[in-house]
Amino acid sequence: MELKHKAAIVTGAGTGVGRATALALAERGCSVIVNYSRSREGAEATAREAAAFGVKAVAFQADVADDGACRALVAAAERELGRLDVLVNNAGTTRFIPHADLERVGDDDWNQIFAVNLKGPFQCARAARPLLERSGGGMIVNVSSVAGLVATGSSIPYCASKAALNNLTIALARVLAPRIRVNAVAPGFIAGEWLAQGLGAAYEPIKQAMEARAALHRVCTPQDVAAAILSLVTGSDLVTGHVLPCEGGMLIGS
């Protein structure tokens, strides 16, 4: 897909991977709705930076766990941008709970993680389908995780939600074809503020361990993941239903 004069929604775009993706799209001439749930200042800053590339960029608040908010998000894209070609389902959440501590996992953990990480992408895709089709077809990219492939990560509910998202990606690719392609990226450890806050003092030792484990001896940055997302958007039109690991070769080891 050629991105110039196209339009995109990126959820959770105030920080991290979402921010990097919104800016990468804008740099290539794609207007963008910069969605956020709580990170208003970050989203508005991202929108300003994206607009500096000469495209239209609008920050829009919506909690993807709420179906009505997802529909309002797509309506904003139609109102502000006039079309929709790309949906990047990046918004996500987790809890940092040791896997062996089963008693610490409560209903709220399951409900919130699945509401954002699984229902959110489904609801956004469902809401976006008509506008994507009216715009000539398009692309949905879900931001998953290697946690959904190997069941190691911040918590068991998080791993399960990403495994389910991988399955959802394949199901949506089947039912939305041939006009809409659906793929996912599965990052490994992503260096940055989100994991640093969640892991605290354990962040640097875990990061070093992940670097040592990866065949390429480094972990992801948000920009690495954004590049993987764009490779799916702008690459072969025959790729759909694919989950692309982006983890420096952690899955194959050194």
Residues of each region from the PLM?
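Short C-terminal tail/terminal secondary-structure segment
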Residues: 94, 99, 150, 230, ...
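Short, small/polar-rich loop/turn modules that mediate ligand/substrate recognition or access, typified
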Residues: 177-181, 239-241
